[in-house]
Amino acid sequence: MTDRVSAGNLRVARVLYDFVNNEALPGTDIDQDSFWAGVDKVVTDLTPQNQDLLKTRDDLQAQIDKWHRHRVIEPLDPQAYREFLTEIGYLLPAPEDFTITTSGVDDEITTTAGPQLVVPILNARFALNAANARWGSLYDALYGTDVISESDGAEKGRGYNKVRGDKVIAYARQFLDDSVPLAGASYTDATGFKVEDGQLVVSLADTSAALADPGQFAGYTGTAENPKSILLANHGLHIEILIDPESQIGATDGAGVKDVILESAITTIMDFEDSVAAVDADDKVLGYRNWLGLNRGDLSEDVTKDDKTFTRVLNTDRTYTAPHGGELTLPGRSLLFVRNVGHLMTNDAIVSDAEGAEGAPVFEGIMDALFTGLIAIHGLRSTDANGLLTNSRTGSIYIVKPKMHGPAEVAFTCELFSRVEDVLGLPQGTMKVGIMDEERRTTLNLKACIKAAADRVVFINTGFLDRTGDEIHTSMEAGPMIRKGAMKNTAWIKAYEDANVDTGLAAGFSGKAQIGKGMWAMTELMADMVEQKIAQPKAGATTAWVPSPTAATLHAMHYHKVDVFAVQKELQGKTRTSVDELLTIPLAKELAWAPEEIREEVDNNCQSILGYVVRWIDQGVGCSKVPDIHNVALMEDRATLRISSQLLANWLRHGVITSEDARASLERMAPLVDKQNAGDPEYHAMAPNFDDSIAFLAAQDLILSGAQQPNGYTEPILHRRRRELKARAGA
């Protein structure tokens, strides 16, 4: 039984109540009683609106299901389909042209194009690493990944391999030549660096060279005659060449260069949503406490590496001498967003006894806005606790709001933020919103969604996986869908990605707000990422998601190769897609799959589902590197789970597979997943006692009940089964 404290109509879990009163409120100048009174009023006033929005989702889905069932034999008529969606209020009229008016936004969001990290807030070590990933070693990123081949004696090995190291140095020199070129010379031939009359001078064997563009020299450390580092700038991003002839690497380098540091994760999303498993008050407080530590600047974590233990803390800002003297200070940490949960889920960390509620758990999205907003106040202040470790330098709080369906839900978020600002005593407009364009009704009405948040919006971002999950679920009754791997090459996906950029640019995002694109999930395949992910900045995106600090450093190279703001200028005013393209349902044209192809698809998805769900349910891990059926490590979160479970639910609904096929595949894949996790002492095997494994049953639920889940979301089943496991463990 949860110990609770009454606060007006609310009963708050004591662990949350004490955390807020004893840790989050001190230092904010907010009175405890007035805060809880404000929480009570916001929850009581806004809960009915939240409920109405969810009812609208269900009503629209029911009408779409019915329409598809009635036309099941006929081919889909695009005009009739479009008219039907308009008639029921799913497809809305686009507003007149407008320009967003958001103000007080940091440069990292408005005028800097670069990588964006997303990390689970429940893991303090990951959160610290991400916040510190503003700067990363290019040498380390190259040496430790497959970007540099292990052929011809260049294996990683245990100790330093000079053959591999030389390949890294050559790669980095080429990057410098491409990004910050010298006039008539190459960094490969450099023998030293110095500063003369505010200009960079690079010594060569018999002569010297200057930068082709002297304006790219941004500063240095050490002395002008003997600098310890050289700071360069390109496309708004910084590159730092570290010089130390006494170091292991520098001693072998003609110019004494020991590393090249890239400005990497410009922004980071601290995630309370798809990458975490937070099902009760204890889980929520763990996340809130880590968010508090990041904002106060005192989050720390003991880390053991090579038998040595040290304490990891947040990096301080970086100071340089400007080219002509004076001091230049650059941020040492990534600018932090926080992703709240969406409008769907409730959490019994707080229950409400307001009229009609009868002890019902409170909507988690309302809670997150209140508590992450309160905590973020610490990141706006310079105090004894955090020194100068503030987050926003413009006084803004950045909240990513996921899984919104259409402009009414965006407007509700803005009303919620406004009410929270009143409770916290913050100026209206302090809490900015990042809109995830990951639900079909938002994609189709994106212009109206942006307009609903025109004075708060700081980013729009495509999320291919969730968006595909909603694509499948919305058209669940239309017929069987194509295979998961084929989804990326469909007409609607290209239209979706292009429309997001076009709509953002038309609303004045360039130079004012981020246009973002999705995650690279193959965490070990960095050579492929370096080759392919450049497509995102080339498409006009000022940011794109990466799964690790190393990936952020490697992806940063793309923003040196591509001037995103120049790309946006070329795209400005273009409309490259139509509503009909966005409405093209990815149905299989004919069921021409061989039995072995169907089995392969089902096994692949069942393995993916089990590999993620078993750690979610049994260990409370919401973001995992899960080996796929071919043992390729993939970064999985609830978005990947949604698409896998919805595809199988769709095939089940249309008789491509039976429930017996799904169960048989789960039983085939569970031993493989058990084997893949054999090295984890915390792991509990699912085979052979499948029906005793709550995780196995959760995976089965997600497939067999997938068609009935609200919008195909996985959270209701995951939360219920995780709480069941916690109850069993505590019994």
Curated annotation (Swiss-Prot):
Its cofactor is Mg(2+). It comes from the Bacteria. Coiled coil: none annotated. The active site is at residues 339, 637. The keyword Cytoplasm applies. GO terms for molecular function: magnesium ion binding; malate synthase activity. The modification Cysteine sulfenic acid (-SOH) is found at residue 623. Its main location: cytoplasm. Mg(2+) binds at residues 438, 466. Its EC number is 2.3.3.9. Keywords: Cytoplasm, Glyoxylate bypass, Magnesium, Metal-binding, Oxidation, Transferase, Tricarboxylic acid cycle. Pfam families: MS_C, MS_N, MS_TIM-barrel, MSG_insertion. GO terms for cellular component: cytosol. GO terms for biological process: glyoxylate catabolic process; glyoxylate cycle; tricarboxylic acid cycle. Glyoxylate binds at residues 339, 438, 463-466. Pathway: Carbohydrate metabolism; glyoxylate cycle; (S)-malate from isocitrate: step 2/2. Monomer. Belongs to the malate synthase family. GlcB subfamily. Involved in the glycolate utilization. Catalyzes the condensation and subsequent hydrolysis of acetyl-coenzyme A (acetyl-CoA) and glyoxylate to form malate and CoA. PANTHER family: MALATE SYNTHASE G (PTHR42739:SF1). This is Malate synthase G. It comes from Mycobacterium marinum (strain ATCC BAA-535 / M).
